């Protein structure tokens, strides 16, 4: 690879070129959109310079239009963004304390500035130490909030004045999280919680994850959890989980669907999550059923019954009677109960729904839409899906089988080629994550140079994940990294295969902010996302501000795209004050890499 720095804008565009690009842009705007543009994902393989179809011509014209619009604004683009005020240290767009639902309309009117870290912010400790010890200045939570609950003091210990230590065997849930997980395993019929993967449990949606102790234990069992909790101005469960290096994102389903397809998770877990399941015509429970795979489990734990008596019959009446009634209408069965924990299993037989009484909840007639914050539906989803495969029947072999690829409509040769591309690319990417490439005399790190620390990155995001093969490449190389695999809503919806592979991810519209707190990711990666977004007329300036918001200080950005778009991105990287270097892949294409690192900025 050739390392090259882009240090300025292009020469002034000639009048003829200006006119030509203007005509191309006008044609692009006037020609109706092709249906295929909203369903075809961007390719990982560098495209040919000769475009043989309308979709490619339209895409290139959109890039040319964006390029023209960008450079016609001149040197004003080079001005650095100011730092936001202290009041926005933990700013999350699209959310406020008065509305439970996500609303991004007012976020577009906010001042454009860089969200700075708090005054006492420190770089997080590397994994796995950072799982158990975090800096108090990195999260918006006070010691009083920790110590105000008697149960919390069992699992937390404050070290000196600036650290919080999470006990590895804590008192989060009754006798400890390990005992709690073992209890769930017993109700399923397993000998130990270590058998979760063998029982088909690879992915868990954890609703209201507390401080992430259950999720941390699942990670140790090679189970992938994802925590969701509503937005909180202080003491956020999501912020704490991410600070510990555990998968999490802001989310609730009070009135809208979660950004996951039907049949996404092997288990849904709710421990003291505060949800009243029998309101809104049971649509909250129906949303759990929608994202739960056939044969999957719903675990509900609540200690509220203690005040109403200690007998098993009293507990069952106070907690599960109404949920039991609803569960029968959606073909769930109560599989076990121990103490305050109840476990239901979703049917593995799709014929169950046709054998119910007429008074039962109906089956959805059409549930093939992309579930991006759509309103909740009063019907049962996913029953006609090709992905209706009970978790107990799923192949235990490593890798993705030909039959699974066929279900998802993916050609095996295309999938295998994508795997090889990312195996090779990751070797190059990882070696580039060093300040050496930003020196006055940049070079590719050699054998004599120190390699990047093995545990340098924990929280990673692939902003245009396609099949999730960057995630797979990281696992193959033994990196202790989890990846938030994001699939753009207007690209081909490949999130189902990502989740079916045991990874985590979400659908997202990159014209909007991502539902997370500031400084929560160590690395952001995107392949051809900028070209994809240019066809959507999204603001790349706002995208870079959002990337800066969610990226940790000293975190990394790796972008792969066409040369023209990468040049624009390099200029925007300077505006958000990142160190940046453009790298020539030297494969004969116009593809380039942009490698950036965010500095620790403070006022």
Swiss-Prot record:
Domain of life, source organism: Eukaryota
EC code(s) of this entry: 2.1.1.-
Presence of the UniProt keyword Transcription regulation in the record: no
Side of membrane Cytoplasmic, spans: 1-12
Keywords: Endoplasmic reticulum, Glycoprotein, Membrane, Methyltransferase, Signal-anchor, Transferase, Transmembrane, Transmembrane helix
Disulphide bridges, residue numbers: none
InterPro entries linked: Put_SAM_MeTrfase, SAM-dependent_MTases_sf
One Gene Ontology molecular-function label: methyltransferase activity
Membrane topology field: Single-pass type II membrane protein
Chain segments annotated as transmembrane: 13-33
Residue intervals on the Lumenal side: 34-603
GO cellular component: endoplasmic reticulum membrane; plant-type vacuole
Glycosylation sites: 96, 393
Cell location: Endoplasmic reticulum membrane
Sequence similarity: Belongs to the methyltransferase superfamily.
Stated name of the protein: Probable methyltransferase PMT4
Species name: Arabidopsis thaliana
């Amino acid at each position: 690879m050739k390392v090259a720095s882009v240090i300025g804008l292009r020469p002034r565009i000639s009048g003829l070129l200006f006119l030509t690009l203007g005509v191309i842009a006008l044609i692009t705007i006037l020609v109706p959109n092709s249906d295929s543009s909203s369903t075809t994902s961007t390719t990982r393989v560098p495209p040919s310079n000769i475009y043989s179809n309308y979709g490619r011509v339209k895409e290139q014209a959109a890039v040319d239009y964006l390029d023209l619009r960008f450079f016609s604004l001149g040197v004003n683009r080079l001005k650095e963004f100011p730092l936001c005020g202290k009041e926005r240290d933990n700013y999350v767009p699209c959310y406020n304390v008065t509305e439970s639902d996500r609303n991004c309309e007012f976020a577009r009117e906010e001042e454009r500035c860089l969200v700075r870290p708090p005054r006492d912010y420190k770089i997080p400790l590397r994994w796995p130490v950072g799982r158990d010890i975090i800096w108090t200045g990195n999260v918006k939570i006070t010691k009083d909030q920790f110590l105000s609950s008697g149960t919390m003091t069992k699992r937390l210990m404050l070290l000196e004045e600036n650290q919080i230590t999470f006990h590895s065997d804590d008192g989060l849930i009754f006798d400890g999280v390990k005992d709690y997980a073992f209890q769930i395993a017993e109700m399923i019929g397993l000998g130990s919680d270590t058998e979760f993967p063998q029982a088909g449990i690879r992915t868990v949606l954890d609703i209201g994850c507390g401080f992430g102790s259950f999720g941390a234990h699942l990670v140790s069992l090679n189970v992938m959890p994802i925590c969701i909790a509503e937005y909180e101005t202080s003491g956020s469960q999501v912020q704490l989980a991410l600070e510990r290096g555990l998968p999490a994102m802001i989310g609730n389903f009070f009135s809208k669907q979660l950004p996951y397809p039907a049949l996404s998770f092997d288990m849904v877990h709710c421990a003291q999550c505060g949800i009243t399941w029998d309101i809104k015509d049971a649509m909250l429970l129906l949303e759990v059923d929608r994202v739960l795979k056939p044969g999957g489990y719903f675990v509900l734990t609540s200690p509220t019954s203690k005040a109403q008596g200690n007998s098993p019959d009293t507990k069952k009446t106070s907690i599960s009677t109404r949920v039991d009634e609803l569960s029968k209408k959606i073909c769930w069965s109560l599989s076990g109960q121990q103490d305050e924990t109840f476990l239901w299993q979703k049917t593995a037989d799709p014929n169950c729904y046709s054998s119910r009484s007429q008074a039962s909840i109906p089956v959805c007639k059409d549930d093939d839409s992309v579930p991006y914050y759509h309103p909740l539906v009063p019907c049962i989803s996913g029953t006609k899906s090709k992905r209706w495969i009970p978790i107990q029947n799923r192949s235990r072999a490593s890798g993705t089988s030909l039959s699974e690829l066929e279900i998802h409509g993916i050609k095996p040769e295309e999938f295998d080629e994508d795997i090889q591309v990312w195996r090779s690319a990751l070797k190059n990417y990882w070696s580039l994550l060093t300040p050496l490439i930003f020196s006055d005399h940049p070079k590719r790190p050699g054998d004599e140079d120190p390699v990047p620390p093995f545990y340098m990155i924990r929280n990673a995001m692939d902003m245009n994940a396609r099949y999730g093969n960057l995630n797979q490449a990281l696992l193959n190389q033994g990196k202790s990294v989890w990846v938030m695999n994001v699939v753009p809503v207007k690209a081909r919806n490949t999130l189902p295969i990502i989740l079916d592979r045991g990874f985590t991810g979400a659908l997202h519209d990159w014209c909007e902010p991502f539902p997370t707190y500031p400084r929560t990711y160590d690395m952001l990666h995107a392949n051809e996302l900028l070209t994809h977004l240019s066809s959507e007329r999204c603001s790349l300036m706002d995208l870079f501000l959002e990337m800066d918001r969610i990226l940790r200080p000293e975190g990394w950005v790796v972008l792969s795209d066409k040369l023209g778009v990468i040049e624009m991105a390099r200029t925007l990287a300077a505006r958000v004050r990142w160190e940046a270097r453009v790298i020539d892949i030297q494969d004969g294409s116009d593809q380039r890499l942009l490698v950036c690192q965010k500095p620790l900025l403070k006022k």
